[in-house]
Amino acid sequence: MKTLLLTLVMVTIMCLDLGYTLTCYKRYFDTVVCKPQETICYRYIIPATHGNAITYRGCSTSCPSGIRLVCCSTDLCNK
């Protein structure tokens, strides 16, 4: 009986959805796993006068404000 109970507990633990975490790009090739409360990936581009724009990427709890901003909510959507 104890073996059956232990087996059922193990199967239950393995089948539980322990939570979904979003994955976003932090740099062009580097990714980061977001915190559970961070449900948005963003990409923010700051144009430069000399031609090299600066791009920031990451996770957020809300869509930050800014020019040339992209917000999305699926894995690796902010490339």
From Swiss-Prot:
GO CC annotations on file: extracellular region
Tissues expressed in: Expressed by the venom gland.
Signal peptide residues on this chain, from the entry's feature table: 1-21
Record bears the keyword Heme: no
Superkingdom as given in the UniProt entry: Eukaryota
Chain coiled-coil ranges: none
Subcellular localization, as worded in the UniProt entry: Secreted
Pfam families in UniProt: Toxin_cobra-type
An example molecular function term from Gene Ontology annotations: ion channel regulator activity
Classification via InterPro entries: Snake_3FTx, Snake_toxin-like_sf, Toxin_cobra-type
Disulfide bonds: 24-41, 34-59, 63-71, 72-77
Keyword tags: Acetylcholine receptor inhibiting toxin, Disulfide bond, Ion channel impairing toxin, Neurotoxin, Postsynaptic neurotoxin, Secreted, Signal, Toxin
Function description: Binds with high affinity to muscle nicotinic acetylcholine receptor (nAChR) and hinders acetylcholine binding to the receptor, thereby impairing neuromuscular transmission. Competes with the binding of alpha-bungarotoxin on muscle AChR (from Torpedo) (IC(50)=0.30 uM). In vivo, causes muscle paralysis, spasms and increased respiration.
Protein family per UniProt: Belongs to the three-finger toxin family. Short-chain subfamily. Type III alpha-neurotoxin sub-subfamily.
Protein name: Short neurotoxin 7
Organism: Pseudonaja textilis
Native organism taxonomy: Eukaryota, Metazoa, Chordata, Craniata, Vertebrata
